[in-house]
């Protein structure tokens, strides 16, 4: 059985663990570039996401998706895009028949004793999976770190 952790959003990530907590695969959220209002934007690709997860779904998987609310200072269109990405993730999980639960950042971070921001998540992920520390070394790898830790939280729940 596999446990999937998801940090949603076009800049998010997916992590897949074995039931014992071993990191199997971690990757940036599959996305495509679209033109919106004359600007290039990244959007989650449901087709690419489904292709990445199908193998794990076929072998038995559960998923834990971070449920994030509105953030101060974030515009209406940004929140709409984030909500759309969240919905795409849930839809892909449902389409692949992967049982899915949402978890708030406050809940999983408290349970994982994670204090601090994105850097703390990267440091903890590198500590938990030292053989994969390179996956979490860049500042922009915070999504991978959080996805991994969400999945690890899910291992404790499953």
How would you name each of these model-derived features?
Residues 1-158:
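Phosphate- and other anionic-substrate recognition elements at nucleic-acid/protein interfaces
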């Amino acid at each position: 059985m596999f446990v999937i952790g998801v940090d949603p959003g076009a800049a998010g990530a997916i992590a897949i663990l074995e039931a014992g907590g071993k990191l199997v695969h971690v990757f940036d959220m599959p996305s495509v570039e679209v033109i919106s209002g004359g600007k290039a934007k990244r959007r989650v690709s449901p087709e690419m996401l489904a292709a990445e997860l199908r193998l794990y779904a076929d072998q038995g998987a559960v998923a834990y998706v971070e449920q994030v609310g509105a953030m101060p200072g974030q515009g209406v269109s940004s929140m709409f895009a984030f909500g759309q990405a969240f919905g795409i993730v849930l839809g892909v999980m449902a389409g692949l028949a992967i049982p899915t639960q949402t978890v708030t950042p406050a809940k999983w971070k408290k349970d994982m004793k994670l204090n601090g921001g994105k850097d703390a998540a990267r440091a903890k992920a590198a500590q938990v999976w030292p053989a994969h520390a390179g996956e979490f070394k860049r500042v922009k790898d915070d999504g991978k770190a959080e996805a991994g830790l969400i999945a690890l939280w899910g291992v404790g729940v499953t």
